Amino acid sequence: MENSRDTHFSANGRDYRLPSTPTVVVCVDGCQYQYLEAAAAAGVAPFIARLLAGASAFKGNCVIPSFTNPNNLSIVCGVPPVVHGICGNYFWDETANQGKGAEVMMNDPCYLRAGTLLAAAAEAGAAVAVITAKDKLRRLLGWQLQGICFSAETANTATLAENGVDQLLDLVGLPQPSVYSAELSEFVFAAGVRLAETRKLDLMYLSTTDYVQHKSAPGSVEANTFYAMMDRYLARLDQLGWAIGLTADHGMNAKHDPLSGEPNVIYLQDVLDRWLGSARARVILPITDPYVAHHGALGSYATIYLPEGGDTAAIIARLSTLDGIELVLDNPSACARFELPNDRVGDIVIISQKHVVLGSRREQHDLSGLTVPLRSHGGLSEQEVPLIFNRRIVGALPSDPLRNFDIFSLALNQLEPR
């Protein structure tokens, strides 16, 4: 920051220092800690290896459900979903369809109940840029932001009026990437580096896609290739003098039979239709988004709306006996435990075990896009995420365990200056 009397700003009850040195926070989609360790051990990610060994590297928790939207918004708001309101990629909106309700994507800023710290920093005078892989996040992350905000998915159509920057393919020097590719995330990193090289920025947020993580386990050739690419761009940002904080929105695990490769799925709507009658209950899968080739809308977290007068306790008890189920809670208990907005969560929250996913009806899931055995997320087993920095942390940590939405507080308030 230059020529500014302000040195701090606030957002959602948390105080932050305006960056005295350029600062970037990176959310690596689906990045469980083991991906970083494996790439470092293989010798393909020397910069990451240095951070893991000699800077500040922690294991923390993401928010539950361990999906993209609720965690990215928690990170950029600095608070859990009960405050900002985004509790899934997809939910049952009781106010939609003229009050009759409808299942909708949770991509519209109208669903946000809190402002982002990015917008607050920009309002306080910081030059801010946000780059996301998937366009579904762009409007949420960029809500009320005066600055640069674009997605790699639609980089070729970015305009000054809408995105604060144009001619991105020329600037970055890469072709428009496919949404189903590792190159989509590389474009995010490459664009971040080019902005750092060509603009006077104070704060950046980079958010990737988990295309590689859905297909490849830690230590695989494909995963290590991805992290080697990421390592080069992070090292360049470090060379340019940027403070770096890296976290993830969630981890990732195999969700298939190790012998057959078939997904391990509990089709909840089929189960409840047998128990209660056809379509009496409604199963919502908050992992649902337009990118079905990643996961086939199969994750380890679901919510259930029961018919009026339904016996919640009895259904919870019955669901708890199903093979592959880890946890079943009623709405008040789940929302208190996971800090979720009660009015956007069903009567029941259900979470499956590490290698099991939850579906709706079998015939409603198009799995033709799954070219490799299913890997997915959403449950408690994908809650652990990294928080790593290229400078040492000064002072006491803000929470124990750390949460991924502590990363801006750590990066702006507690990194040791160089």
PLM features per residue range, with description:
Residues 36-83:
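Short, structured active-site-proximal loop/turn typified by the sulfatase FGly-forming signature C/S-X-P-X-R
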Residues 28, 66-67, 91, 95-108, ...:
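Secreted, luminal/periplasmic, and some membrane-associated catalytic domains
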Residues 57, 127, 243:
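Residue-level detector of anion-binding/catalytic polar loops
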Residues 30-33, 65-66, 81, 135-138, ...:
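Short, solvent-exposed loop/turn segments at secondary-structure junctions
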Residues 3-4, 76-217, 223, 294, ...:
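His/Asp/Glu-rich, glycine-adjacent segments
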Residues 351-413:
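Low-complexity, glycine/alanine/valine/leucine- and proline-rich hydrophobic stretches
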Residues 20-36, 50-51, 75, 121, ...:
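Beta-strand elements within well-structured catalytic alpha/beta cores of enzymes
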Residues 1-56:
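Active-site-proximal N-terminal segment of extracellular/periplasmic enzymes that hydrolyze or transfer
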